[in-house]
Curated annotation (Swiss-Prot):
This is Integration host factor subunit beta. The keyword DNA-binding applies. Heterodimer of an alpha and a beta chain. GO terms for molecular function: DNA binding; structural constituent of chromatin. The keyword DNA-binding applies. PROSITE patterns: HISTONE_LIKE. InterPro entries: Hist_DNA-bd (IPR000119), Histone-like_DNA-bd_CS (IPR020816), IHF-like_DNA-bd_dom_sf (IPR010992), IHF_beta (IPR005685). GO terms for biological process: DNA recombination; regulation of DNA-templated transcription; regulation of translation. GO terms for cellular component: chromosome; cytosol. It holds the Pfam family Bac_DNA_binding. Keywords: DNA recombination, DNA-binding, Transcription, Transcription regulation, Translation regulation. This protein is one of the two subunits of integration host factor, a specific DNA-binding protein that functions in genetic recombination as well as in transcriptional and translational control.
Length: 101
């Protein structure tokens, strides 16, 4: 699912709201999560999961095309840890529908 599909699904489930208002709400939520992560804060959505920022130290990588060594700078990256309810729900759906890979 992509963001526009999420917006469409939410707008369909809430016909009393205008599509543009649903889009504005989704964008505001995502902007809030992004801003909090940019400040180094942790964002927890109980039952769904938690977003945080992790430090990746500098390392030596390889260019896959040429095989030459390349210095990769240290950086901070977003990290998501799933919540217990989300893990259990996904696992249950896989057990009841084994053709999902």
């Amino acid at each position: 699912m992509i963001k526009s599909e999420l917006i469409d699904q939410l707008a369909e489930a809430n016909p009393h709201l205008y599509h543009r208002d649903v889009e504005r709400v989704v964008n505001t939520i995502l902007d809030g999560i992004t801003d909090a992560l940019a400040r180094g804060e942790r964002v927890e959505l109980r039952g769904f999961g938690a977003f945080s920022v992790r430090h990746r130290p500098a390392r030596v990588g390889r260019n896959p095309r040429t095989g030459e060594s390349v210095a990769v700078k240290e950086k901070h990256v977003p990290f998501f840890k799933t919540g217990k309810e989300l893990r259990e729900r996904v696992d249950a759906s896989r057990e009841s529908n084994p053709e999902i890979a």
